[in-house]
Amino acid sequence: MIDWVTAVLPCLHVPVDAGRVLSVAPDGSVEWESVKFSRVTGSFQSSISVRSQGSDGNGKATHLYVDGNPSKWLQGHNIVGSDDLNGLMIAFYARMLSLLNIPHHLESYRQVLSGQYELKRVDINYMFELPTLIDVRSWLHAAEFKAKTRHGRPATAKGTLYFGKNSRRWSIKAYSKYDEVNCGKKAHGVPEEIKKTGLVEWSKNKLRLELTLRALQLTDINLNFAKNWSTETAYTVFKEYMGRIEMSGNTLLTDTQVINLPSALRMTYVCWKQGICVTDMVSRATYFRHRKVLKEFGIDIAVTVDRVDNSNVVPLIRVLEAKPASIPSQYDNLIFSSNRVSSF
């Protein structure tokens, strides 16, 4: 599903007045100023940040810079949602103009309808089914030690796993949506009307995997304009990036195998086994040479040896190879559809 979107939408309009932030020098001169964001509230008190941008030379702004979660804004929740980025943004655009009392500008509207606008960030996520909530938490714990991407090992914070958390291009995070909804924070909660449908309970044994694509990466893969997105794009891109997560199935060598290793390689293996950072012990060239050889034995010294039960390794891999969890038809009316725009 499409989750968070940051976009620059064509919209000729009288600038939305939300105030300004100024930097004033000691002599009283203004060093710089920036227009503040307005918070536009949608369904169930969910809001999106909006700011006027550009100028036509006659006092009107030419674009709206929007930043937020159109799925949650329209649906009241983002537990499940639509892969239709263009449909979501068209419905969001129409509703937003109405709430801001901005008259429709025909040419601007045509541009939005045809996807002629720039995307600065897109988040895509899907749910993957495990037997229980305990299994979801165990998966996250095991992946902390067993998984990595080109960004390296994941960082963890409050039960969420982050791959490339501070990357300016792309990142992945994994977490329990059920735990997030029930963490007690207002921003992550869902309305009682949604809870009563059973959707939150349905998410209890689901692992959430989320891909964030930022401006530089969107440009590189030619998805920085909405016109290049179809309803299949989200899952296709998501699957490709999930394939970048490497899972280690590290197992310890037998005594005979250790004895038969060349002495230098044996020392590297023993240090790794004891939890010592190998990169502190050998040169960069030696590290990569030893890593390549040890990988033939099913050992990746780039992944720290840990005490996690190896029985978790197969589920780690199988989850990433599996298809996202099927959403029961009883929840169809809780998911945005361009065929039912009037209900959102």
Swiss-Prot record:
InterPro entries per record: G2P, G2P_C, G2P_N
Catalytic reaction equation(s): ATP + (deoxyribonucleotide)n-3'-hydroxyl + 5'-phospho-(deoxyribonucleotide)m = (deoxyribonucleotide)n+m + AMP + diphosphate
EC number: 3.1.21.-, 6.5.1.1
GO MF entries: DNA binding; DNA ligase (ATP) activity; endonuclease activity
Pfam families: G2P_X_C, Phage_CRI
GO biological process: DNA replication
Keywords assigned by UniProt, alphabetized: DNA replication, DNA-binding, Endonuclease, Hydrolase, Ligase, Nuclease
UniProt KW Hydrolase keyword: yes
UniProt keyword Ligase present: yes
Reported function: Isoform G2P plays an essential role in viral DNA replication. Binds the origin of replication and cleaves the dsDNA replicative form I (RFI) and becomes covalently bound to it via phosphotyrosine bond, generating the dsDNA replicative form II (RFII). In turn, viral DNA replication initiates at the 3'-OH of the cleavage site. After one round of rolling circle synthesis, protein G2P is linked to the newly synthesized ssDNA and joins the ends of the displaced strand to generate a circular single-stranded molecule ready to be packed into a virion. Isoform G10P protein binds to double-stranded DNA and prevents hydrolysis by nucleases. Additionally, G10P is an inhibitor of DNA replication and may have a role in the transition from semiconservative replicative form DNA replication to single-stranded DNA synthesis in the life cycle.
Family statement: Belongs to the inovirus G2P protein family.
Protein name: Replication-associated protein G2P
